[in-house]
Structures are given as structure tokens and as C-alpha cells.
Amino acid sequence: MEDDGYYLDTDLDLSFTSTATDRTFTSSSARSSLARSSLTLSFNDRLSTATTPSTTTSSAATTLHHRRYDPHWTSIRAATTLSSDGRLHLRHFKLVRHLGTGNLGRVFLCHLRDCPNPTGFALKVIDRDVLTAKKISHVETEAEILSLLDHPFLPTLYARIDASHYTCLLIDYCPNGDLHSLLRKQPNNRLPISPVRFFAAEVLVALEYLHALGIVYRDLKPENILIREDGHIMLSDFDLCFKADVVPTFRSRRFRRTSSSPRKTRRGGGCFSTEVEYEREEIVAEFAAEPVTAFSKSCVGTHEYLAPELVAGNGHGSGVDWWAFGIFLYEMLYGTTPFKGGTKEQTLRNIVSNDDVAFTLEEEGMVEAKDLIEKLLVKDPRKRLGCARGAQDIKRHEFFEGIKWPLIRNYKPPEIRGLVKKTKAHAGHVTAAVTPRRNKWLWWALSHLLRSKSLSKSSSKIQSNNNYYHYVGKKL
């Protein structure tokens, strides 16, 4: 049991040193958000010795999220139970290595001290002393947004810890890094259609959830899409979000669907089957929660992903996320963004003035992808796909045909270079995925074992019968 009187927050050495290789999961790309801080947090300071433990506060989440058997929550509950005041403090954590630098601070891999089964967390450390008042408001925005989220494709805020001039946010750790780094490991920095459809579908569901809460993301890009250990995505960095009112609606939608059915006809004594097409009307009930009244004049985001209305400075709403979603699709397919110029200024001019987007690949599925991207990259947000009824309109597009959206979390992540996946064997424990070759060997071993037992039982039964008849014969 940890002695709370020994590891004082005032004695916590924030100068991080590790024998492990300093691996950063933040992309080395020059692309950055327009509201990005020029923060150069050295993390070589110690908390002032004048600080008392009473000034260190912690607000660990008290609600149990949907991941009921998540080992993270098990570790958190164990640590808070052993703590003298029932709260988490910085002294409870051990920093493992530096992961990268975000818009507002630095991120570290850490785990709880004295935990029998150490579980990795990402600790985002923000030095409030080096931030402007506007940047501090971004910190509070991100903390507020994180506290609202409960979704498999979004991070969980396990705790917020304020110590001296530091604010620390404890969230999920994603060992596979970000999607931008993963793209750079692929041939020509691009992905085939199938993985693109997988990642796009999960991002779409995450955006749908945010919009249902009235949250406009405004910073969608591969650098902000992290890959969990099981290969599924997690959006990150919510400091540029803004909230708006949203009124959920539940409507019945009528549409016509063309179907075909075989019909047998007799011609010249033969029996032939012909296809007869007919139209039928279907009524589908849809839930939609799009913040259509959202409005902001702040110019924030990443220049290559900015929507035309945002560049023009005339105000924008949730439609900027659907524009960015179209840019995101294009970059995954082509390895670059469609309006990229030689400079940031040229890129912004291209976004406002260029009407045509170049499409060169002709592989299977590109026709549907091209059509979806063109409908998302409509300069007038009133005509842009998704701006009226949100993600529901995008889900119905042919590019996503065949996806069972309620089961999206159960789809198997793609096999692509640089993606190391792990699967959950049972609740709370994670094990490496079994390779096909090992899987084949396991099945062979199992069948061999069962066959051996079957032969053993048969031999035993024959021997038993022989003994029985031998005994009966003697008795007779």
C-alpha cells in the first residue's frame, strides 16, 4: 500500500528522464492549426515548494462509462480507494516516456504506481503560466468537451488534475500513433479503397456523435485521428471546438428503390428466366441531430482543411466539419489534399477560387468515392452534403453501401503496413492477435487431441467389453 505522506505533489520532479527511446506520435508535418500555441514547455521545472497538497485538486470521473470492464477504470478505482482523500494526484503516476506535443501542451505515456497490472494512460500536461488568456480558455473548452464524451471512437477523460500552474488531463493511450504517420508508411502515402472506407466510416460516426451533442469539431485531419491498440480510431484535440444548440429530430423518410425479380416465360417450348425491374416505395425512420443553427466567426483549424466560408471570414457552422471530411477522404486516397499550394496563402486562394478537384485513380470503388467527395466539397454550405440532416445523408451514399452502422464497432480493422493490432481475449485483458499460421496449427493440435481421446475411448470400450465377456464366459 502506498504511503500518501511520502509521495508529495510538492516533491514531484517534472523533469522527465527515461532510458526508453523518446518516441513521438505527433506528426512531423508542417501542417498546424491556426490557433496553435507557440508553447515550448520545457517540463524541467519542479513545482514550487511553497505549494501545499491542499492546492492540488483532482476531479476523477465518477460515472462508469460504457466500457464497463475497462482495466483503466479498474486501476483508477483501486488508486482512489487507497488514496487518503479518495482523489488522484500526480504522485500516483509514473511517467514512462514522452509521446509528443499538442496544441496546448505535452503528452506523456504513464501508468499508475504500484499497480499489479500496469495500464497505459496518456497524460496531457499543460503549463498555464506560458499560455495567454485565450489559450487558457481553449484548455477549459477541451476539458469540458472531454467530460461530456462517452463513445468508443472518442477519448475518455479519466481524471483532471490541477497542481500549481499545471493542468493535467488523463485520457486513453493509443499505441499505434496517428493516422498521418500511418499514411506516411504506405506506398505513395495513400490507402486502398477498403481501408479508406473503414477509417472514414468510424470518423463519420464520431462526428455524428459530436454533432448530436451540439459540438462542432473544426480540426479534423489525419494528425488528430489516433489508432487504438485494437486498430479502431479515436479522435483527439478538442481545444478548437465550439458548442451550439441542437434539436434532435426523428423523421420518416420516403424514397423509391429499384429492384429486380426473375420471371419465367415460355418461348418456343423452352423455359427462360428474365429479369423484371420494378420500383417500390420504402419508408425509413431516421434520427438526426445536426446543429444547423451553429455559428462562429473564429478563424481556426488547419489551412489545408479550412472550408471556403471559414476562409472568407463570413461566419461558419457545422458544415465546416463535412467539408473537412471530404478533404480527409481525398488525402487518404491520394496522399495529399486537393487544394494544396506552394504556400499557405496559395492553398487558401485555391480553396476559395478553384472549383474542380483532380481525380486520377480508376480502381474499383473510385466512382463512388469521387461522387461523395464532390458532394462534400461544395463551396456553398447550404448545398453541401451533410449540412441539412447531418451524417444520415452521408451514410446513405453508395460509397458506404453494405455497412451495418449499428455494428460498426465490430468490423475488423484492415491489414495494412505499420498497424499492429491486438484483440481482447476477455474482459479486462488484452492479448496479441493470433496469426493465420498459428491459428491453423492450433486447430490441427486440437483436432489431433480430440482424435486421440476418441481412439483412447474406443480402445478402452473394446477392452472393457472383452473383459466383460471374458468374465461372463468364466461365470457361465
UniProtKB/Swiss-Prot annotation:
Pfam families: Pkinase (PF00069). It is an enzyme of class 2 (transferase). It catalyses: L-seryl-[protein] + ATP = O-phospho-L-seryl-[protein] + ADP + H(+); L-threonyl-[protein] + ATP = O-phospho-L-threonyl-[protein] + ADP + H(+). Disruption phenotype: Enhanced root waving when grown on agar plates. GO terms for cellular component: cytosol. Its EC number is 2.7.11.1. Its main location: cytoplasm. The keyword Transcription does not apply. The active site is at 219 (proton acceptor). PROSITE patterns: PROTEIN_KINASE_DOM (PS50011), PROTEIN_KINASE_ST (PS00108). InterPro entries: Kinase-like_dom_sf, Prot_kinase_dom, Ser/Thr_kinase_AS. It is found in: Cytoplasm, Cytosol. Expressed in root tips and lateral root primordia. GO terms for molecular function: ATP binding; kinase activity; protein serine kinase activity; protein serine/threonine kinase activity. PANTHER family: FLIPPASE KINASE 1-RELATED. Belongs to the protein kinase superfamily. Ser/Thr protein kinase family. Over-expression of WAG1 induces a basal-to-apical shift in PIN1, PIN2 and PIN4 localization, resulting in the loss of auxin gradients and strong defects in embryo and seedling roots. Serine/threonine-protein kinase involved in the regulation of auxin signaling. Acts as a positive regulator of cellular auxin efflux and regulates organ development by enhancing PIN-mediated polar auxin transport. Phosphorylates conserved serine residues in the PIN auxin efflux carriers. Phosphorylation of PIN proteins is required and sufficient for apical-basal PIN polarity that enables directional intercellular auxin fluxes, which mediate differential growth, tissue patterning and organogenesis. Acts as a suppressor of root waving. This is Serine/threonine-protein kinase WAG1. It comes from Arabidopsis thaliana (Mouse-ear cress).
